[in-house]
Amino acid sequence: MKSLRLEDAVPQSGSRHRKLRVGRGHSAGQGKTSGRGMRGQKCRSGGGVRPGFEGGQIPLYMRLPKLKGFELVNPSSYTIVNLKQLRDLPADSEVNIETLLDAGILTATSGPLRVLGDGEAHVALQITAAYFTASAREKIEAAGGTCTVEA
């Protein structure tokens, strides 16, 4: 077998084309207008329109509304309850998502329970939740209740 040498390497047949010489007469195939047609902006040197140009009409990228903000990829959702919703519960009762669903205070859950401080804590409650606001914790403990943060 003959050894392969660099000077013997040639491109495959049909893979290389000669550069098309435009504007060099009729017989060359691309004479006179060089394949650009007759007159107009597109036939001129440097002619053409910018990307997105629609002939003077308001282009699509300007007709569409601008995006407002962005959407989170993995948004976190919580089940929210305010202290004013807990005013009808009996004193010293255990409060968590299950008991709130049973009592009819919540109709559905959408994540961990968060207790917010809107309203007053009238009775002592033992509340178990994932998060308490500072005002909610203060009002619950002032009424004699306890706040337990679940992991």
UniProtKB/Swiss-Prot annotation:
Q: What does this protein do?
A: Binds to the 23S rRNA.
Q: Extract one GO BP annotation from the record.
A: translation
Describe, as the record does, how this protein assembles with itself and its partners: Part of the 50S ribosomal subunit.
| SUPFAM superfamilies registered for this protein in UniProt | Ribosomal proteins L15p and L18e
Residues covered by region (Disordered) = 1-51
State the name under which the record lists this protein. Answer: Large ribosomal subunit protein uL15
Q: Name one Pfam family in it.
A: Ribosomal_L27A
Under the heading PROSITE patterns, the entry gives: RIBOSOMAL_L15
What gene name is given for the protein in this entry?
A: rplO
The family annotation for this protein states: Belongs to the universal ribosomal protein uL15 family.
Q: Which GO terms describe its cellular component?
A: cytosolic large ribosomal subunit
Show the ranges annotated as biased composition (Gly residues).
26-38
Q: What is the lineage of its organism?
A: Bacteria, Bacillati, Cyanobacteriota, Cyanophyceae, Gloeobacterales
Q: Which NCBIfam families match?
A: rplO_bact
